[in-house]
């Protein structure tokens, strides 16, 4: 072998068979030009590890200025060659490439790197796309109270992506209306409905499952589960039949959103025999279906939910996803399921770099949340969309959750522009400290009625009682015998309505807005600053999704070059959001 060294440039050990003359090989690292965008593209300290082969132009010569290179790299459908020219690094489309051979002739240039095409529909696991009838491995997660609206779900379905309707917190009537609309509007397109764990309202969870089964909702997103429940297992097992090979074929599919290993283990395994026996005894599934369920995981897809808005354990994505992938592999080896569970990532997917990182770590698909609430199709209000558009990464805080208030479970919400988190925490502290409303010191009760309730405790209790008489009368039986339960239900009235005030843009309640949001919202705002997506009125879910996926392709192209030893200046990589027309031109 021969080692070539020139001032400022270190080349690796190059086999003599691939060596080329010093005149052709030598170049000096070129600094980016700070005074103009059309600068040489190489960064300082660039190292070319090894010449891959040789490249010869056809009709187009290599380009070396950053504007031209940016255009080529941004054309993600085009295969590219990175070569060494007499004037430095060049990038070219087309031409002839020869790998692993001696220099074929003087018209050939040293080939430093190659970039194959990478398009948005190539990201993720194609099995996820096939299973759900999608073009892209991209999903919008369910945001409760209809924030994950039917509008979002329809837009996603028509664009070849998967949208999940935010059924949590809604009445059976509202959910039924959404089913009617989406089944009529997305006849041959994919859609998903949320099923949230409701430990304080098990009857409502059962009623939602009954509705989904009766109306033929074939795909649900299960969220906030701490353990499997009989209604959830019933949904999965109902309709099971043996396939041609005897393996179970599920009619009802589940996307499980989890952040804990112990919960993920339950979804990546068959349902427990105890729950299956309970369902068989109740006549809700057949013995044959229960037997088939013993060789079927509880979910088809599992979302590793990192630091997200709403219910979250604030897990870091960079550790959570690999952990879930390893757990899936271990349980797949144990159970030998016919189709392995696919693992996606949610929480922090708000920039091209975030999406690219997820796919690079092995995510089968990505799920977005907070950024969709800021879009015009969300079930939120213009006031909330403006608040979200101003949020930074540090403008989030944890606050008590309405649906699991008594358990001390918290949700991540927006802190900027609202006092909800502080006021909700005060209610939780009073609940923990006192056995009843009457036991709370009078000055404290006055403040709660003035700031949070804006009415007397008994007036709010009357409203709350009327609500549960319709929704779940069994809750009232507990409240009639336990004053602490009664107090909790009134406090949950405030927590529950605070998100509805935000969704409706209630002008007199802005300081009480509960806006579920993760730090990804701040990252998104930083990414779109100075672009057409900076304005909340321009934020459409499909445009946001396509820009994230396209930008991820560009980021992955950059990473591919870096792995081959070629480091280009930042301006060579177009990751800023594009208008729909500009994006269409790039993807031609």
Predicted regions and their residues:
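Glycine-rich beta-strand-to-loop/alpha-helix junction loops that act as flexible
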Residues: 342-350, 368
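C-terminal domain-closing interface element
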Residues: 200-224, 396-440
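C-terminal catalytic or substrate-handling cores of phosphate/nucleotide-
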Residues: 415-479
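Non-transmembrane, aqueous-exposed alpha-helical and coiled segments at domain scale
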Residues: 318-339, 351-359, 376, 389-393, ...
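Active-site entrance/lid segments in N-terminal catalytic domains of soluble metabolic enzymes
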Residues: 40-340, 353, 370-372, 404, ...
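Catalytic or ion-translocation cores adjacent to nucleophile or general acid/base/metal-coordination motifs
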Residues: 173-175, 307, 353-412
């Amino acid at each position: 072998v021969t080692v070539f060294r020139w001032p400022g440039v270190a080349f690796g050990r190059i086999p003599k068979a691939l060596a080329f003359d010093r005149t052709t090989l030598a170049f000096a690292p070129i600094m980016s030009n700070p005074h103009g965008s059309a600068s040489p593209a190489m960064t300082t300290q660039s190292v070319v590890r090894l010449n891959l082969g040789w490249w010869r132009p056809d009709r187009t010569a290599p380009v070396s200025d950053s504007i031209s290179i940016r255009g080529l790299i941004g054309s993600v459908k085009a295969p590219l060659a990175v070569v060494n020219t007499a004037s430095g690094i060049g990038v070219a489309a087309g031409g002839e490439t020869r790998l692993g051979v001696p220099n074929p002739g003087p018209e050939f240039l040293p080939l430093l790197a190659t970039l194959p095409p990478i398009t948005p529909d190539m990201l993720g696991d194609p099995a996820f796309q096939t299973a759900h009838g999608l073009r892209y491995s991209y999903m919008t997660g369910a945001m409760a109270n209809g924030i994950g609206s039917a509008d979002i779900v329809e837009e996603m379905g028509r664009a070849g992506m998967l949208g999940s309707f935010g059924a949590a917190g809604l009445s059976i009537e509202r959910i039924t209306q959404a089913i009617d609309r989406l089944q009529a509007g997305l006849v041959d397109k994919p859609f998903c409905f949320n099923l949230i764990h409701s430990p304080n309202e098990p009857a409502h969870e059962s009623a939602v499952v009954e509705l989904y089964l009766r109306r033929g909702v074939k795909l649900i997103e299960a969220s906030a589960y701490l353990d499997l429940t009989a209604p959830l297992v019933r949904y999965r097992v109902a309709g099971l039949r043996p396939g041609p090979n005897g393996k179970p074929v599920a009619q009802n599919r589940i996307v499980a959103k989890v952040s804990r290993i112990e919960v993920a283990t339950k979804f990546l395994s068959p349902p427990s025999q105890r729950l299956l026996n309970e369902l068989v005894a109740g006549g809700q599934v057949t013995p044959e279906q229960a037997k088939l369920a013993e060789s079927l995981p509880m979910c088809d897809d599992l979302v590793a939910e990192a630091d997200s808005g709403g219910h979250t354990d604030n897990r870091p994505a960079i550790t959570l996803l690999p952990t879930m992938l390893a757990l899936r592999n271990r349980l797949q080896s144990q159970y030998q399921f016919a189709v392995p569970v696919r693992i996606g990532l949610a929480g922090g997917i708000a920039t091209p770099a975030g999406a690219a990182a997820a796919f690079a770590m092995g995510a089968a698909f990505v799920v977005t949340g907070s950024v969709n609430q800021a879009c015009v199709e969300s079930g939120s209000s213009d006031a909330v969309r403006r608040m979200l558009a101003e949020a930074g990464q540090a403008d989030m805080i944890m606050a008590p959750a309405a649906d699991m208030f008594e358990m001390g479970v918290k949700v991540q919400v927006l802190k900027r522009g609202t006092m909800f988190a502080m006021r909700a925490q005060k209610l939780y502290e009073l609940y923990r400290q006192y056995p009843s409303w009457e036991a709370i010191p009078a000055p404290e009760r006055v403040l709660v009625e003035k700031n949070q309730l804006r009415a007397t405790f008994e007036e709010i209790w009357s409203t709350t009682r009327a609500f549960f008489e319709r929704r779940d009368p069994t809750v009232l039986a507990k409240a009639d015998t336990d004053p602490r339960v009664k107090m909790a239900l009134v406090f949950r009235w405030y927590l529950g309505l605070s998100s509805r005030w935000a969704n409706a843009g209630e002008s007199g309640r802005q300081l009480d807005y509960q806006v579920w949001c993760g730090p990804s919202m701040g990252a998104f705002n930083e990414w779109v600053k100075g672009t057409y997506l900076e304005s909340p009125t321009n934020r459409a879910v499909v445009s946001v999704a396509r820009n994230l996926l396209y930008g991820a392709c560009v980021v992955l192209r950059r990473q591919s070059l870096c792995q081959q030893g070629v480091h280009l200046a930042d301006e060579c990589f177009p990751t800023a959001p594009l208008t729909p027309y500009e994006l269409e031109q790039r993807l031609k």
